[in-house]
From Swiss-Prot:
Function: Catalyzes the conversion of S-adenosyl-L-methionine (SAM) to carboxy-S-adenosyl-L-methionine (Cx-SAM).
EC numbers on record: 2.1.3.-
Species whose genome carries this gene: Pseudomonas aeruginosa (strain ATCC 15692 / DSM 22644 / CIP 104116 / JCM 14847 / LMG 12228 / 1C / PRS 101 / PAO1)
HAMAP family named among the record's database cross-references: Cx_SAM_synthase (MF_01589)
Name of protein: Carboxy-S-adenosyl-L-methionine synthase
EC class of the enzyme, as a word: transferase
CDD domains: AdoMet_MTases
Amino acid sequence: MSESDRLFAQPQQRVADFVFNEDVVRVFPDMIKRSVPGYPTIVENIGVLGAQFAQPNSVLYDLGCSLGAVTQSLRRHVRNDGCRVIGVDNSHAMIERCSEYLHAQDAMYQELLPVELIEADILALDLQPTSLVAMNFTLQFVAPDQRLGLLRRIRQALLPGGALILSEKLRFADAQEHALLTDLHIAFKRANGYSELEIAQKRSALENVMLPDTFEEHRERLLAAGFSRVSQWFQCLNFASMIALP
């Protein structure tokens, strides 16, 4: 069971860049629930939507799988014969805890898809032919100049009829819209018990690590990577999820 997120509750003389280490892993489920509006809806529906694109005897990828929430959702919803999920994350602590969570899921459910967990940098990963790739709040942590190359490799690996489901925090080209949705997101975090100090220090920790794009930038990049259609299927405040088709 996860702990309550208090990582930024005490004043820090110097706020270090955010990393997905053991401290974050311990509180991650609580952190994500209290920080990302709509997160449970996104995760559950990646499984629902993913089942529409998953093909028999194919690989499904969860790139940047963290604790495996999307992997678990895919295992619950996809029923195609011969499918398996590959979860990939570069954090050793995340992969270890994810494995524990998946073993717990195996104890509760029968006939779930098999899973392989890989500790690796997704930028260096050799992708197998795949009918579905999920990246749930992962691309925003990839260096901007490496995002197009990664998406091109994903597009090349996708089977005909497959899909990429991409969830990201958004920024907005219109300054007033960006300010409004940023303020509303801060209000969401306040309502979930975060103090002004916690909000400010976490923002400082993330500002050089997580670099969001606008939806228009995502769409243009996905089209440049070879995708034919990009549709946004969900948005709550400044968090969104989209489907890109080959």
